[in-house]
Amino acid sequence: MFGFIASPCARCTSESIPIWRGTFCGLARVLAREYSAPARLLVNRDATFLALLGLSIDPSPPNWKNATCCNPLATPYPVDDIHPAVTHAAAVTVCGLATKLGDDSHDEGGLRKLLSKSGSALISPAVGKAIARLNTTSFPTASVIRQLADQEHHEATSPIQADEATARSFGTITAHLAELLGLPQLKPELEKLGSAHGRLVYWRDAWDDQKPDLKKGRFNPYFHLDPSVIKERIQSTWADFTSALTELPFHRHSQLLTHIGENTRHRHTDFLGLETTTGEKKNRKGKRGKNEKDGGCCNHCDCCIPCDCTMPKRGTGGSCFDRCPCDGCDCCPCN
């Protein structure tokens, strides 16, 4: 998954889509500059959302500058690659990869286990640099590592709380924006938002991994809990996420963040088990043919490598954002 958070629709948010793109590509630039050129490929929507939150709650305006991302021959566009929230998101992204590889080396076997161990060794210098950067900002790195180490304990003692380690880690990561920006009064709301985000990430991954986990005999909470219990947990967590997002006092980009929340809900409708309106049902029913006719991109663009923008447009007419062949593009409910 490229991230739980859905990217905004380029048509519906045409005025603010450059903000998402500038944050996404600013994050990619930090990853490349600080942790190696290949590290830019780690850029993802969840980390971009974290960076955008910081840009939006900061009373000081972003430091936009014209730059390119992955294609030096592209036309420069506004990015922010020095804001504390962006550099924080980059550091936790690198550490997140290290955690993922560590989990894979523990859970997998054969070639995948070997590849995970090799990958961990290769990224070790970048991880060390990311941890050092986090420590210089008073981020509780050791505490988060301990939280993640408790994962198996939560799984063994209470499957319904198997999401606890991920929730606490995301909560700590998101709440640290308050420390970085000198906004201690926002820490509770940010922690609530991050914790809910982490729980949703955990349950979505578990939902997606049911078949491989069953095949390999790995723990999955869906094998140990009644579906109604899981549904209630997910829906209450989604309610926490949306309420926390609403409670934050944004100085800018509030419309974009609201749309991202709506688009994320639409993207995960089946997983969330939420009721859809009649209009949404009709829209989903007819969307596949329309999107195939229009080029299959659903009008999203995060976007870095293809949209920088040397690749030919698919379909006829439209801008890069309208015909972008980028990462998989989630369909927007308002197309």
Give short role names for the model-derived ranges:
Residues 229-272:
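Primarily interfacial, aromatic-capped hydrophobic alpha-helices that serve as membrane anchors
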Residues 1-192, 199, 203-218, 222-233, ...:
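Acidic catalytic motifs of isoprenoid enzymes
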